[in-house]
């Protein structure tokens, strides 16, 4: 180009986006006057981890994260009390419900039933349209979380009491212990607990692994058992809830980061929707590791039907041996039906120089119970039980009870 403008380097600058001084003063006034502050953070906290931890220390505030904030909030955070929402922990739910002030940072958390009643709410978001969109708020601040917290921090006074924080931390420790107690080899019984699969994947994967997760039950186990450390990534269709996203997301992640380990936690329903993309792994020599949660069902749909009091129908899946399919394509492939074989199978798959498919037969009736169950949901489960028996399918109900009650009593 004769003008030469395309040859000139682009000099990037960093913009600062924060509320005005009056907005910051009002936020500080509310937070300083509160006795039980809880912080709810989302994906907007990316790049503001240290500022968030410093703020939580000043306010003695437990920090709860929404799903999309998990990878940016929970690591190296002594104030973390887990996640809230349908996939979350009882500790996160309770820390929010017991707050007299909720500080929302970079989150458009949609579930109104998980917000506190009667608490004051301050919301910070770079997108002004998100302010007050999900719940009534007392103060909305437009700005990035990083810039806003940097300007807000000097206006805050150190809270003398840790009562609310320590109570929330104790509850989280108890909840975490209970959850981790489910991610075990269940006395070598088959089918395998999905919690155990996710727990092993977490332990065996590399420190900078990129995890991609299918919508449905795999995202539940990923949210509860994958540990983020500031280097790992967690990718999924967390806004739109699109099925079959784990494999294509993994293809994209592996292409973008060829030197990193990419692990796809796929549901059997999701994987079969885009089965042909397994060939893409071979054709493009992408060493993605695919772990299939094979429960022969659209598992999360079944859970929603149970909660609505509907007897399951149209959710059965007749699956092939996914490990054999992988081998037929030229990839590493293994099927695991017994928990004692799982760790070695995952170890071998992760060490394989190329794409790998591990087909894990998991418990169909394992319930991903939310942190709080409404009266309507409890009524729905009761109706499901009655209607299932009346339909002559009492064996399904027995399997449900055995999987979720008996095993927990024995552990």
Q: Where are these predicted regions, by residue range?
A:
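Glycine/aspartate-rich loop-and-adjacent alpha/beta segment that forms the canonical ThDP
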Residues: 1-17, 113, 345-411
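Glycine-rich, acidic loop regions that bind phosphate or pyrophosphate groups
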Residues: 15, 69-170, 346, 350
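Glycine-rich phosphate/diphosphate-binding loops that line cofactor/substrate pockets in enzymes
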Residues: 23-37, 96-98, 200-209, 254-259, ...
